[in-house]
């Protein structure tokens, strides 16, 4: 027996050492957290608290199991998209239940909107001041709130007695979202309500259904993408993804649908087995385009990616142009109709905001506005990059290890610039690069401009309010724009990528438990 174990370790000692290294790193971080604010720690690893016990179980048992699942994937003939589910499902479930409701950005308002839709109220009602209001169960207001500081507080609110009382709750920003954005969450809430479940169960059902929809979309994105499969898988496993995936945020649908949409179009263009665009493909493209355009209007430029599909796969240039024009015009028209309806809820949230004057300023002073954009990007660049790499998760209070954040920045750059041996190598033509660049730039401009108009004071020298997660749905486009033949990466890195992402998420999970157990703003940095 011992000889077999010895041979097993000797056969792949480098990977074994890698796993032990990740385990040790995470255990050190847990130890630092524990010893910083708590007494009674045993340095030999025998922890007294449930926090330490759960952390050790996640690091050693779950981390070890998933790492060896990754190691044996080739031998067990597990496809990459299925391997993604093996890692994503347990990580997502942990994040779903160890992050208190409301501790994801804007989740309190997303929950109210989903509750309203589950009751059949697809369109908000405005009060005399123009605020969007809805009669929501009083327990929702008490239970799903971003003021929860710790698990004790969250548990107390979750176990409050059920009530039939309804109170008017405002959610102005959510009134701008089309009902489709909260359809998965609303479905989970509606089904559990049919079976007589209380508010707590309804809310977690909303999270779980939303999580399932996001997983299905990302699974199919990995399955369909003809190249850069490991990059897509890696991005889909980053903590910034799992920060919103198992929540009630509409960002789940936005991220999942954007990844799926890009992958599907690239599949139709570069997959040699796809000889023609079928009716099924046209239906899928049309529905996907309309959903993306309704998720957030700033992402509507993604629809120009339809232009990269070769005319030969439509049968003729005329057929391609007719279909593409109809789909794009339909998406724009649908957005204009929705914007025309919900514009009644466009109110100025902050002091000094004047949307009409701000639009006029941008149109009449384009050079000055470009300078404001450049100044903002330069000022917040580190914040954006760190945020996309795992800094300030949860409701901006959960911080991953600085080691993981720095490593993620480097690893993401390498995967963007290179190709893994064995992955399908595709020469991206100049037209695809151009369209991808146009879509990327247009979306970035819309993100900044929409917030500058609605959120920032008139002629403000910086654009505040832009969150790093806003860029995540389009991050893959950068790999289409830049030359991806600059590096040739050894195939063995694929195991490292998935193992790294697994332990990074476990680090975030333990940091989340630490944050909400002690109710403090933590730094899990190793200096």
Q: PLM features: residue spans?
A:
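Interfacial juxtamembrane loops and adjacent helix segments
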Residues: 119-205
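Perimembrane helix-loop-helix junctions
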Residues: 266-277, 300-331
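Membrane-lumen/periplasm interface segments of multi-pass, membrane-embedded glycan/lipid transferases
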Residues: 336-422
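Start-transfer (signal-anchor) and selected internal transmembrane alpha helices
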Residues: 1-23, 45-93, 322-328, 428, ...
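Short acidic/glycine- and proline-prone juxtamembrane loop motifs at membrane-interface regions
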Residues: 247-254
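Transmembrane helical bundles and short interhelical boundary loops of multi-pass, membrane-embedded
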Residues: 30-54, 339-353, 493-527
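Membrane-interface alpha helices of multi-pass inner-membrane proteins
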Residues: 243, 280-297, 302-308
């Amino acid at each position: 027996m011992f000889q077999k174990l010895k041979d097993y370790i000797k056969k792949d000692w480098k990977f074994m050492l890698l796993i032990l290294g990740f385990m040790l790193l995470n255990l050190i971080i847990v130890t630092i957290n524990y010893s910083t604010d708590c007494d009674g720690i045993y340095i030999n690893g025998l922890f007294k608290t449930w926090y330490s016990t759960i952390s050790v179980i996640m690091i050693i048992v779950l981390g070890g199991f998933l790492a060896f699942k990754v190691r044996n994937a080739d031998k067990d003939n597990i496809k990459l998209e299925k391997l993604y589910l093996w890692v994503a499902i347990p990580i997502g479930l942990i994040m779903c239940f160890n992050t208190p409701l409301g501790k994801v950005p804007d989740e309190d308002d997303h929950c109210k909107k989903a509750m309203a839709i589950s009751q059949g109220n697809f369109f908000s009602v405005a009060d005399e001041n123009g605020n969007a209001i809805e009669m929501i169960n009083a327990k929702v207001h008490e239970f799903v709130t971003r003021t929860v500081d710790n698990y004790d507080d969250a548990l107390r609110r979750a176990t409050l007695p059920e009530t039939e009382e309804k109170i008017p709750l405002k959610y102005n920003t959510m009134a701008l979202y089309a009902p489709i954005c909260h359809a998965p969450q609303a479905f989970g809430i509606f089904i559990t309500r049919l079976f007589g479940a209380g508010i707590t169960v309804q809310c977690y059902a909303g999270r779980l259904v939303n999580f399932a929809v996001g997983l299905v979309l990302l699974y199919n994105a990995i399955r369909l993408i003809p190249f850069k499969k490991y990059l897509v898988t890696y991005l889909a496993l980053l903590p910034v993804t799992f920060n919103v995936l198992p929540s009630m945020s509409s960002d789940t649908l936005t991220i999942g649908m954007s990844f799926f949409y890009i992958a599907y179009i690239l599949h139709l263009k570069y997959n040699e087995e796809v000889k023609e665009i079928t009716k099924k493909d046209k239906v899928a493209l049309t529905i996907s385009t309309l959903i993306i355009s309704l998720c957030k209007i700033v992402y509507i430029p993604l629809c120009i990616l339809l232009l990269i599909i070769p005319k030969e796969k439509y049968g003729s240039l005329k057929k391609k142009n007719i279909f593409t024009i109809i789909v794009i015009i339909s998406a724009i028209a649908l957005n204009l109709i929705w914007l025309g309806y919900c514009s009644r809820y466009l109110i100025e949230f902050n002091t000094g905001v004047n949307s009409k004057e701000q639009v006029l300023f941008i149109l009449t002073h384009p050079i000055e506005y470009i300078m404001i954009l450049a100044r903002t990007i330069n000022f917040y660049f580190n914040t954006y990059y760190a945020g996309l790499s795992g800094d300030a998760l949860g409701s901006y209070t959960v911080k991953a290890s600085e080691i993981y954040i720095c490593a993620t920045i480097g690893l993401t750059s390498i995967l963007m610039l290179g190709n893994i041996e064995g992955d399908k190598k595709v020469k991206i033509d100049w037209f695809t690069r151009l369209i991808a660049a146009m879509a990327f730039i247009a979306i970035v401009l819309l993100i900044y401009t929409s917030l500058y108009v609605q959120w920032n004071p008139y002629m403000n020298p910086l654009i505040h309010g832009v969150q790093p997660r806003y860029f995540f749905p389009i991050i893959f486009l950068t790999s289409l724009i830049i030359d991806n033949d600059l590096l040739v990466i050894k195939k063995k890195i694929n195991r490292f990528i998935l193992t790294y992402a697994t332990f990074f998420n476990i680090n975030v999970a333990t940091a989340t438990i630490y944050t909400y157990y002690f109710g403090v703003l933590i730094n899990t940095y190793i200096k």
